[in-house]
Design a protein with these regions (language model features):
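Interdomain "pre-motor" coupling segment immediately N-terminal to P-loop NTPase/helicase cores
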Residues: 3, 7, 11-64
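Pre-Walker A (pre-P-loop) alpha-helix and adjacent loop at the N terminus of AAA/AAA+ ATPase modules
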Residues: 65-100
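Short glycine-rich substrate-engagement loop in P-loop NTPases that contacts/grips substrate
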Residues: 77-86, 128-157
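Conserved catalytic network of the ASCE P-loop NTPase/AAA+ motor domain
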Residues: 92-95, 120-123, 154-157, 162
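Conserved post-Walker A coupling segment in P-loop NTPases
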Residues: 97-100, 117-120, 124-140
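Walker A/P-loop nucleotide-binding motif
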Residues: 97-113
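Conserved nucleotide-sensing/catalytic segment adjacent to the nucleotide-binding pocket
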Residues: 147-179
Length: 179
């Protein structure tokens, strides 16, 4: 009956974990408040994890991205230091609506760092979109005629962080630039 009530209130994560929560409450002789707190915390944790996975999927990152914790700035040829990477990981630039531009020749780790920051942002609750410039131009050109492109453009516009890769490699017309 408890599971059905939790599902009625769309507390799906808590409903799924209810047997474990009840067993833990019995073993620890939890009060009603402690049990209710555990149920609600379980639901919040489940929703946050689901949101994180959904945001990761919607970001369209390239394969094999790594979290920033796995980065050793010395293995990158970008010249970024540990101190700079630490400041960027705090995401205060994102809270202040700032922009970052990583520029340089291929092979420096610009995409890897940008995607690592994007992953950090998703784990901190932000929405992120990753697109290569060539694909972004296609999306802009076809957004009015193709449903999928229009949907993707809408997601890009709503994202709190947009990562555009390979900007300098793709020529764009004035009309495309002003969309």
């Amino acid at each position: 009956r408890l599971t059905a009530l939790l599902e009625t209130f769309t507390l799906k994560h808590a409903a799924r974990m209810l047997p474990d929560l009840l067993e833990t409450a019995d073993l620890q002789d939890s009060s009603c408040r402690e049990f209710l707190l555990a149920v609600l915390e379980t639901e919040v944790k489940g929703r946050n994890e689901r949101r994180r996975k959904r945001n990761y999927s919607a970001a369209h990152f390239p394969p094999n991205i790594r979290p920033l914790e796995e980065f050793d700035p010395e293995e990158l040829e970008s010249g970024i230091t540990h101190a700079q990477l630490s400041v960027l990981k705090e995401l205060s630039w994102l809270d202040n609506c700032g922009n970052l531009v990583f520029a340089g020749p291929p092979g420096l780790g610009k995409t890897m760092v940008a995607c690592g920051l994007g992953l950090q942002a998703i784990n901190s609750g932000y929405t992120v979109c990753f697109e290569k410039m060539t694909n972004l131009i296609k999306i802009l050109d076809t957004a009015e005629t193709e449903r999928a492109a229009g949907f993707r453009l809408k997601n890009i516009k709503k994202a709190q962080l947009v990562i555009i890769d390979e900007i300098g490699y793709t020529p764009i017309s004035r009309e495309q630039a002003n969309r």
